[in-house]
Amino acid sequence: MGQKVNPTGFRLGIIKDWTSRWYDDGPVIAEKIKQDQVIRNYVHARLKKEKAGIAKIVIERTTKHIKINIYAARPGAIVGHKGEEINNLSQELTRITGKEVKIDVIEVIKPEIEAQLIGENIAYQLENRVSFRRAMKMAIQQAMRAGAEGVRIRCAGRLGGAEIARAEQYKEGKIPLHTLRANVDYASVTAHTIAGAIGIKVWVYKGEVLVQRLDAIEEEEMKKMQERRGDSRGRGRGDGRGAKRRRRPAKKA
């Protein structure tokens, strides 16, 4: 199961959160899902020239406005001089959606271990006729140096302009796909080359999540159990609840 399913969707609600965070019911849901995709496509196309390095876009909705959180490697390219670029983008999205749009830009601390950015970097190199093997190996080395515990990259298509399409992959470290507490970042990117489209899939293992929280919960439960045992022992010895009841003498008629 873990070998086939999307690692992000497999962990939703456990260690991963949704990128669209809002609630609605009725036929409006389909319209809003479609609008979220339109927003993401527009932001990616609009900021492609700036090379901001967008890792992900999180959309939150209220009744009056839409809040968009953009996680980027170069936030300065999105904000622009004195915030001009981000204000223009906010106004454009307001016209498209018909609601007030607020944009927050959050910096990605380690872009070398973000699966989306790794995939886009490899796609850019393939489109500029760089050897796919060199691009994949360089990306893996950079990610491992940046602190990743495991990286796997797979390219499929007419690699190197070959007549017959094939798939090749490189892996370093470990990628636990079945472990739900394993923080595995996944992305799929398409490179449009002269020979045709090449699909790029990236898995990055960043370590386990919730291990410390689970240990803390177990410790708290053990302490509570010990306290309960201590209380029950104290009651049995001291307050007479645990002692045998004495029989009262029968009344004489």
UniProtKB/Swiss-Prot annotation:
Q: Which residues cross the membrane?
A: none
**Annotated GO MF terms:** mRNA binding; rRNA binding; structural constituent of ribosome
Please note every region of biased composition (Basic residues).
243-253
Say yes or no: keyword Lipid biosynthesis present: no
Q: Identify the PROSITE patterns for this entry.
A: KH_TYPE_2, RIBOSOMAL_S3
Describe its function.
Answer: Binds the lower part of the 30S subunit head. Binds mRNA in the 70S ribosome, positioning it for translation.
Q: Which HAMAP family match?
A: Ribosomal_uS3_B (MF_01309_B)
Q: What is the protein's given name? A: Small ribosomal subunit protein uS3
The record lists the organism as: Chlorobaculum tepidum (strain ATCC 49652 / DSM 12025 / NBRC 103806 / TLS)
Phylogenetic placement of the source organism: Bacteria, Pseudomonadati, Chlorobiota, Chlorobiia, Chlorobiales
